[in-house]
């Protein structure tokens, strides 16, 4: 499988509703009416379907269903429906699992299709929700939560938390929290429910299980990823919302009976399939909800579903907002997708963030918010939604600027940083905004290789309406396609600064340009390697000699203790030893003299035998380098001069107190600990000023001293002993 990141691909074929009552399982409803033919599966039942143009077909199906078809087509569809009815009992048993699958991921594979659901069973006490102790709140309220994407993944959770799991869309006209008038209607629903339970209690409590099954056809190499994303974001949340309504108003069972009644009536009158489905969608809110989920999710859109006047939910698979890869020859291209390696959440950006947190849940405080549509339009939608977050969202949107990071907006507006991150995360999740590195005039931007040139004509007209008095879109793209230079060089004057930043935001929003970012790694020269090698060998020799010296002292003390016993034999022993040594040709053993079996063994514990000392190396992760690379780094730092030496071409005398050269005067040994963690080849150096709260000019002077040559600093002549970086620039 290619490493290229892919946009959401639901691979959705159909949605099935199964319920189980005292009489047994029942196949209640499915959409679309003929899923195999509509998704192109009938022609190739043993392989992958040739195309996945089902989204357009499903979107157009509603109009064709409502308008009807010819009588011949209706008869054929009715005949097909009657044939499929004979196999309904098979699907009923297959998709109706045992109680052990309660609130767990249920998955069945048949050929290329996967049937995935989240079965919900009635509790042993006959209720659908655990009864909590009543405190001040006596009425259950739908708490779908306007940030459903913050749900902690897991299949088994407390029932009280499940109400918060289903995601909602604050920017939709439907709100999740019931208003006072809605609560009154909830009370009337409960009273009517109590009356109906008294009249027909046997039927009301007869359902024991329901299962909304999603039929999927994912590519083989992406099977687990596609199944998991639609299960976590759609299947589980939709089933939890239905469970909430079932516990509150017996919703699923009532709708299942209503759908069955309409189908029986249509069967008696020989109603066509298209007419039947039009009637079901118009008269059953559950059938309409399933239809809405299928139509929107299969098209990778947001599905806003209203289950009742009090409860509405919004479901989606989080969209892919950017990609760090260009598509290869065998990959599907997605022109217009933002091409960048900038990730709104990385361990370096936010060390306190949970590594298991999804990228769209927590945004780094040093990122900024780029609205994907006009601010006035978004504010209008927010005010129309009337949700609990509406006032806070409106206030934050008015304060937000793509040139200011979340931390800077928090300091300027007084809004807590955690609140800003939550609101920005909400806007990003619901496709209203994008998290980007803050726009700056010293940054470099260029035309994206992934821009969609097929939309250039349409984009030019829209650009002309937005910026009628400024250079045209082709001229701006042509200027940005030249030699890379800071964006500020394109701004004619300070009066044009705001307008040109608006142009840059517009270009980024449409994927026309992207930021040229700089990355660097520390280069270790052969000279550094040899110096460390010699130092390590000296340490080994010193260690060996110190060990041998201690043993010599021990042997010498023993020898002095034995001299009193052997005073009479000294002469004879000495002469015999000398003769023996001369005959054998061996050297006379003396205390402390080197013995043949006592060799110098260098441990080389820090040395890699495969490391070449004649070639340079790059250190991948200097902030957590292994022992040998740490010694290399120490040797590099030890060679930095105590007093920086530099000169500027064209200037003979430079004032040492001139703030323009502040980054050139400080000793590199003092600056090194601040910068070293960014020299890993993955963290862009453009983020250093933002994260370390330093001036950009000072930062780039320091980086230039370290060997990162850019056009703006090439006039500075620096000390070669400090130039230890290898740089590369890309998106």
Swiss-Prot record:
Residue span of region Disordered: 34-90, 129-156, 168-187, 549-599
Record-given protein name: Nitrogen permease regulator 3
GO biological process: cellular response to amino acid starvation; meiotic cell cycle; negative regulation of TORC1 signaling; positive regulation of autophagy; TORC1 signaling
Family statement: Belongs to the NPR3 family.
Biased composition (Low complexity): 58-70, 572-583
Domain of life where this protein originates: Eukaryota
Biased composition (Basic and acidic residues): 139-156, 555-566
InterPro entries: HTH_NPRL3, Npr3
Biased composition (Basic residues): 45-55, 129-138
Keyword Signal: yes
Organism: Aspergillus oryzae (strain ATCC 42149 / RIB 40) (Yellow koji mold)
